[in-house]
Curated annotation (Swiss-Prot):
CDD domains the UniProt entry points to: WD40 (cd00200)
Entry protein name: Small ribosomal subunit protein RACK1y
Organism: Oryza sativa subsp. japonica (Rice)
SUPFAM superfamilies tied to this protein: WD40 repeat-like
Classification of source organism: Eukaryota, Viridiplantae, Streptophyta, Embryophyta, Tracheophyta
SMART domains the record matches: WD40
An annotated Gene Ontology molecular function: translation regulator activity
Quaternary state and interactors: Homodimer and heterodimer with RACK1A.
Amino acid sequence: MAGQESLTLAGVLRGHNDMVTAIAAPIDNSPFIVSSSRDKSLLVWDITNPSTAVATDPEAAPPEYGVSYRRLTGHSHFVQDVVLSSDGQFALSGSWDGELRLWDLATGRTTRRFVGHTKDVLSVAFSVDNRQIVSAARDNTIKLWNTLGECKYTIGGDHGAGEGHTGWVSCVRFSPNPMAPTIVSGSWDRSVKVWNLTNCKLRTKLEGHNGYVNAVAVSPDGSLCASGGKDGTTLLWDLTEGKMLYKLDAGAIIHSLCFSPNRYWLCAATEDSVKIWDLESKLVMQDLKPEVQAFKSQMLYCTSLSWSADGSTLFAGYTDGTIRVWKVSGFGGYAI
């Protein structure tokens, strides 16, 4: 890894009226992203012509990085998560109204509603082949769906032979490894669980956190899992062996984790900053903070992270409704 690489603020995306909860970027690097928010909507952003302005005045506000051209509405409560299909045609959202929705991005319309959770949906994911959908909720269950909106399996509650989580399931992800089809989940019961996708049976229970788990992320090759939450530590797990590899101390509550698609970096959104770890040295190579400092009562912090597919751009959603866009040096950035 080039030791000199760093991230600089390239601009902002403004359009949400409440906290940004999730950001999804297409895997083919198309110039758009989709974000979800507590304003009960999703926004589709055009980033075809991002600002390349470099500020000469460090006090100047960062430039607008793109424009929202479609607002997706229909959920009756906070939209907590959003992901994209691999072809970039559809967005999938989960909401505190207890439903998932599949959206046709060409029309902005809901094409499918997924009804079955009895409490707030906190996390959603698409399988690599887009044929399966997984969701996690405050009803302590994980549900596996087909794209027709039919629930094929429920883990937890009265289902799953007592293997399910005993607290809110805050985050769920598919492993991208086709040789080991698995689902990884994190919960407020302080555990991370790995499930066999073929039969929805528990494969491994990963324990080590001292507080609730907010976020899990799986590395691009499917070999590693990172988890984080209330205790302010990120645990790195070997998914094949089912064992903890090491800890990284973030020092504050972790709300989101994501691996860089093409560098050995792990990013954590905490209540203090966005931390970028170099996993080779296991050191924080950068601490990203917003260009404005909020009053303590406002608690301005990052809630959600997503990398562009080419690894050049980090999108970070904040409690103030703004998405801040950070560029890896060499890809053009905005000096602050």
